[in-house]
Amino acid sequence: MVPSWPSTGCWRHLPVVLAALTLPWTATLAAAEKSAGDYFVHSLPGAPEGPLVKMHAGHIEVTPETNGNLFFWHFQNKHIANKQRTVIWLNGGPGCSSEDGALMEIGPYRLKDDKTLMYNDGAWNEFANVLFVDNPVGTGFSYVDTNAYVRELDEMAEQFVIFMEKWYKLFPEYEHDDLYFAGESYAGQYIPYIAKHVLARNKEAGTKQWNLKGLLIGNGWISPPEQYEAYLQFAFEKGLVKKGSDIASKLEVQLRICQKDLAVGESAVDHPECEKILQEILKLTATRGKDNKLECYNMYDVRLKDVYPSCGMNWPSDLANVQPYLRRKDVVQALHVNPNKVTGWVECDGRVGQNFNPVKSKPSIDLLPDILSEVPVMLFSGAEDLICNHLGTEALISRMAWNGGRGFELSPGTWAPRRDWTFEGEDAGFWQEARNLTYVVFYNASHMVPYDHPRRTRDMLDRFMGVDISSIGGDPTDSRLDGEKGPETTVGGTAGNGNADQEAEKAKLSAAKWEAYRRSGEIVLVIVAVAAAAWGYFVWRERRKRRGYQGLASAENGAAGGVMGGNSGFRNTHGGRPRSDVEAGDFDETQLDSLHVRSPVEGQEDARYSLGAVSDDDDEEEEGSAAGAKGKEKETGKAAESS
């Protein structure tokens, strides 16, 4: 006779057995219970006095099989103008965090020091919800197994659409917003690819339409050939290099090598022989400073100099505060950063950039004509940027054919005029537009235009989105094109918080939110019912066993043993597979993180420029260390040794 468990033994093992029986359902329950409230940021260390901007932050899984999670930081709009809008912002790299945009460019706060935030006058969340995403996986606070970094642009875009679908399920009240993608530098590749996938998704049967209304790309890396050829032209026009000089002759030789490579090679996002042009400009124009240190031009703002070979990677000055702030334990906890992410925040992750090698991807310039047939696009450029300079952008526009014409030609021999832009009485730049494409040049601006001119870029954004402030009041800014005031926009504060239309919009959004919560509650009830049924079945079998059903008792002992073993197994696995490093903990955080431009230092061909990237080691300050570029990583050759 097979003995049955004593009554005391049965109840002693009951918690373990019940846990084993219900563990799969518990995992599902936990996922179902994840709601917008779990991402709500209740407080933000160092925030200025007064009401906190409503925000949510955290991770969304995009590739469960490789622990791929994208981090987001969402700020709600301060006012609703005539409609709801959402702007998704991406920085470049590849591998540079969009927290650059959040804390140094268009977010509601900027850092006064590494502990104190202050309001950003000109933040983009005045009339639009703004969503910052560390993209692709591995960038900033995002993470992924170290053998699963993204390599191609389509792969990146596919993962981003997954992120958006899951994000809208959490926040359904935003799914019907007018949607805009914005970013800078290497985001000039990201944004068109994401837009292509969003437009394709909208054409699929049974999908909710996302109201993609426009793209904004600042100092974008879009068409490599035009940008490579513009380096030397820009250097001549800015007086960095004198025409006819020995330096000019050497650079012209490298340009011809590049042109030959472009003529025989396939269209690609990067061409190593052409990358050397920028590297050579920085090397050959370096000079000795007052302290006898070798100095070079800042490739992101040629009005400035930097110690060679950094050439701009110590810029902007706000970087000195951003990394310490985002590594604070209380900040990490406030933003719901997964504690399993074992490395601290870095501006530009060199591992992401080194693995992102889109050899199968075409440059995004190939996508723009089709996108322009459906969606307005705005390209804007800071006039003092070298690495993704405005001359290259103007060349790609002139050569591109879209919507029945080429470039800004309105008719044979007639081009769209460049309209002088003044902002609050100052010359701000110029605007040019035709057939769904708008181009804006910002005078006295760097690679990171919003860093230099937050108010002007907010005015640009509001005009592009068609913001109408008549419904909310506020003093319109004095912004003119050729002396004429256009639609009224406002930069700074507004007179009031809205009208009946705004209240109706808020009521509609609230209803959508509660509907999502109701659906989540129904799912939870179903899961609890299933778990209860499993427990009831277990109790029924135990009672039958104690009544002496020998065969059943024998089977029950085997089943119980299997369940107990399963419980032990679950403790060591995740999702039915062995747990792997969320993000390789053996990564050497003393290495300098880089962008896409390899350092021009002699003997350091594997290092990369990373627009303003800083070392992961706060104490690493040695001259000659590798570095990279915050917007677009570019491969460069060797640099001459310092004399």
Swiss-Prot record:
Assigned protein family: Belongs to the peptidase S10 family.
Listed PANTHER family: PHEROMONE-PROCESSING CARBOXYPEPTIDASE KEX1, SERINE PROTEASE FAMILY S10 SERINE CARBOXYPEPTIDASE
Name of the protein described by the UniProt record: Pheromone-processing carboxypeptidase KEX1
Main location: Golgi
One Pfam family in the UniProt entry: Peptidase_S10
Comp. bias (Low complexity): 489-500
Enzyme class: hydrolase
Function as written in the Swiss-Prot or TrEMBL entry: Protease with a carboxypeptidase B-like function involved in the C-terminal processing of the lysine and arginine residues from protein precursors. Promotes cell fusion and is involved in the programmed cell death.
